[in-house]
Amino acid sequence: MKFYIRTFGCQMNINESEIMAGLLKEEGFEWTENPKEADIILINSCAVREKAENKMYGAIGGYGKLKDENKNLILGVGGCSAEKERENLLERFKNIDFVFGTRNVVDIGNLVKRALNGKRFADFSDKLNDVNYDIPKMPISKHHAWITIIYGCNKYCSYCIVPYTRGFEKSRPMEDIIREVESYAKKGYKEITFLGQNVDSYGKDFGDKKSKLDLLIQKAAEFDSIKRIWFLTSYPSDITDSLIQTVANEEKAANYFHLPAQSGSNKILKAMNRKYTREEFIELVNKVKKEVANVTVSSDFITGFPSETDEDFEETVDLIKQCRFERINIAEYSPREGTIAYKYQNDDVPKHIKNKRLQYLMELQKRINLEENEKYLEQEVVIIQEGKAGKNGTYMGRTMNNKLIIFESNEELNGEFLKVKVNKITPGPLYGEVVNNLY
């Protein structure tokens, strides 16, 4: 029997889909990239914004048509939307055979077998204690591994559904993570990314309430074949001086931080239940840029959060101008049922104002990007080739500080270190030509 997995959302979802695929292959199922060939279709959903949920609903409808043609087709839905909607999905969509949660992904083999027996069900049991380093996976990349080190989030930002769909923070044992890093190192992997909804909270639940992400990075760096270590996603006020120094001093730690600000207004940050002020955030960015050589910093912002005035928005604009991020992700505020903001804060900023502010920030960031990218012109940079950038024979890779470079190459060099000379800059990627193969 063949299976197909459709993944929406974040890197953690991608990692969990890799795990589900690996477990199903171990059970004797065969993976297919064509849903029309599949006997089992799994949807790994996202609930961060309404748009992501709508994509899931569209997928359910589309695969439901396949089920009309193949009555034996099994359709399962997991991920954050499944955790949020639970049994309602079974009631609303009669073509769904089973629904499962975010903390029992490792039980997917048993869940599929139950579904094959013909009974519809929902299962949201917690199986995180069963997660370990040797769980089978089907990695997308042959050189870059994604490793989830902490599950859940305790922050309860007023707009965010994640604490309700992912649960409380739970860190994996450090020795288990290191054994997983070792397994990838033995396979020749060059890059790893440590994942978590709040990755710099790793280890705080071990007893002393101190983050141990810095120590984890140091231990992972001991493996010779591992050349780059990344981590996503950070919570600004949880970034420690020790972590900054580890990134500054450990040559294998990527000199890149993703620090979601969400707003530049103290009034809005308080309404969002973010645990820092604009002044503290700017101070953190300045500290990172001072301590870590050639570092880049990216961020996230929400436009049109309830009660956001023009003055609040101008404070966000000013923060972006001061911090000069390498990249920003921007989203219009999307009310999420079940969150504090949905219950207690009126969605009072008109849609067209949300979009106008989003477009303004995008144009501002483009100008900043172009100015910041000028220093790379005619410079030689080291990248790892990731794969194709398009259909015209171009490939892409990233520098140690997360600059995206596009160049002509060939598939045989995927996963290899290359030196590329930058000959064109844009507000987005840089363009160049390969100088030589380094390894």
Swiss-Prot record:
Domain MTTase N-terminal: 1-117
InterPro entries attached to this UniProt entry: Elp3/MiaA/NifB-like_rSAM, Methylthiotransferase, Methylthiotransferase_CS, Methylthiotransferase_N, Methylthiotransferase_N_sf, MiaB_methiolase, rSAM, rSAM_horseshoe
Gene3D superfamilies on file: Methylthiotransferase, N-terminal domain, tm_1862 like domain
Residue span, TRAM domain: 369-436
Chain sites annotated for binding [4Fe-4S] cluster 1: C10, C46, C80
Keywords noted in UniProt: 4Fe-4S, Cytoplasm, Iron, Iron-sulfur, Metal-binding, S-adenosyl-L-methionine, Transferase, tRNA processing
EC number(s) reported in the record: 2.8.4.3
Pfam families associated with the record: Radical_SAM (PF04055), TRAM (PF01938), UPF0004 (PF00919)
Keyword NADP: no
Reaction(s) catalysed (UniProt annotation): N(6)-dimethylallyladenosine(37) in tRNA + (sulfur carrier)-SH + AH2 + 2 S-adenosyl-L-methionine = 2-methylsulfanyl-N(6)-dimethylallyladenosine(37) in tRNA + (sulfur carrier)-H + 5'-deoxyadenosine + L-methionine + A + S-adenosyl-L-homocysteine + 2 H(+)
Cofactor note: Binds 2 [4Fe-4S] clusters. One cluster is coordinated with 3 cysteines and an exchangeable S-adenosyl-L-methionine.
Localization (cell): Cytoplasm
Gene Ontology cellular component list: cytosol
Transmembrane stretches, start-end: none
Obligatory cofactor(s): [4Fe-4S] cluster
Coiled-coil intervals: none
Class of the enzyme per the UniProt entry, highest EC level: transferase
Gene Ontology molecular function: any one: 4 iron, 4 sulfur cluster binding
Record's function text: Catalyzes the methylthiolation of N6-(dimethylallyl)adenosine (i(6)A), leading to the formation of 2-methylthio-N6-(dimethylallyl)adenosine (ms(2)i(6)A) at position 37 in tRNAs that read codons beginning with uridine.
Family: Belongs to the methylthiotransferase family. MiaB subfamily.
HAMAP family, per database record: tRNA_metthiotr_MiaB (MF_01864)
Entry protein name: tRNA-2-methylthio-N(6)-dimethylallyladenosine synthase
Native source organism of the sequence: Petrotoga mobilis (strain DSM 10674 / SJ95)
Source organism phylogeny: Bacteria, Thermotogati, Thermotogota, Thermotogae, Petrotogales
